[in-house]
Amino acid sequence: MGEKESGDAGEAQRERILRAAALVMAERGFDAARMRDVARGAGVSIGLLQHYFDTRDLLFREAFEWSIGELIARWRKGASAEPDPWRRFELLVRELADDPDLQRRCATWTEFCASAARRPELRDGVRRAHQDWRELVLGIAESGVAAGKFVPVVPTDVAVRSVLAAVDGCDMAVASGSGMGAEGYAAVILATARSVLGVRD
């Protein structure tokens, strides 16, 4: 087991730990996740984990926020150059659905939300993630309305919240092993958004 690294190598090591922690949390749940499993998955010692994260709860909270933040960054990068609002939204949904870690990401999000219902100290992380999602989708919706390409059937904010609720529902379906795959995941979210945003062809 190596020592704590610095600079770019240190950031890569920290990301490897967070990725391993997100996977452990998805598999075991927040309350049952153990640092020894993270250490094994990341190929580091428990002592090294404690250099980066003072407590177990801090490690798993940061793993959750890293998991969501990584996805939102990929969303923004993947669609930032697309001028058409609906096409931009489609690209974002494909980025979600085609994630090779779709099962892990959905399970992590679902588990963290369930844990936040029992543990108030986790709720800020869930609220921040929801706010980031909302701002991203709201920006696309407002662009579509301004361009005359979207005519929402309900107030725009309600339409956006409906889309986010569809994403949450699809995440739960994937996490629970209900049989929903990437194509079904994308189809449900796109159909919901097209309906509530009043997308004009």
Give, region by region, the residue ranges found by the protein language model:
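N-terminal intrinsically disordered/low-complexity leader segments
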Residues: 1-12, 19, 201
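Generic hydrophobic, amphipathic alpha-helix propensity
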Residues: 13-21, 38, 63-67, 71, ...
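Helix-turn-helix
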Residues: 16, 23-58, 62
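Short coil/turn segments at alpha/beta junctions that flank glycine-rich nucleotide-binding fingerprints
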Residues: 27-31, 82, 147
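Residues in soluble alpha-helical coiled-coils and helical-bundle/repeat scaffolds
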Residues: 54-58, 80-83, 97, 101, ...
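Hydrophobic alpha-helical connector segments
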Residues: 62, 73-106, 156-163, 186
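Amphipathic alpha-helical segments used for helix-helix packing
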Residues: 87-88, 101-124
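Hydrophobic/aromatic-rich alpha-helical bundle segments in the mid-to-C-terminal region
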Residues: 122-127, 131, 145-194, 200-201
